[in-house]
């Protein structure tokens, strides 16, 4: 299959959505743009992808590899 690239930006990544993100991370052909907490003090469950890494993530995905580190 063709790769699917996901760049998350959500206020609930480390809440109830963590389960869904985890399921996607182990699926074949699904690749994540590296992401991390954007404001741990004010929004402890919030994560956002490093949008400057989209092109590099696509290059890796086309080679069937997940860019590392995926968690920032």
Predicted regions and their residues:
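Helix-loop-strand module that forms the ligand-binding subsite of alpha/beta enzymes
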Residues: 1-17
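Residue-level detector of anion-binding/catalytic polar loops
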Residues: 3, 30-31
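Conserved binding-pocket/active-site segment within a compact domain
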Residues: 20
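Flexible glycine-/small-residue-enriched beta->alpha junction loops
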Residues: 27
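Glycine-rich phosphate/pyrophosphate-binding loop and the adjoining helix
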Residues: 31-72
């Amino acid at each position: 299959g063709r790769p699917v690239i996901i760049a998350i930006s959500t206020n609930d990544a480390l809440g109830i959505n963590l389960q869904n993100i985890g399921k996607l991370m182990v699926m074949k052909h699904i690749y994540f743009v590296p992401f991390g907490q954007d404001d741990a003090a004010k929004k402890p469950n919030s994560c956002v992808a490093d949008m400057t890494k989209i092109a590099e993530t696509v290059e890796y995905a086309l080679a069937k590899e997940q860019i590392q580190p995926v968690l920032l």
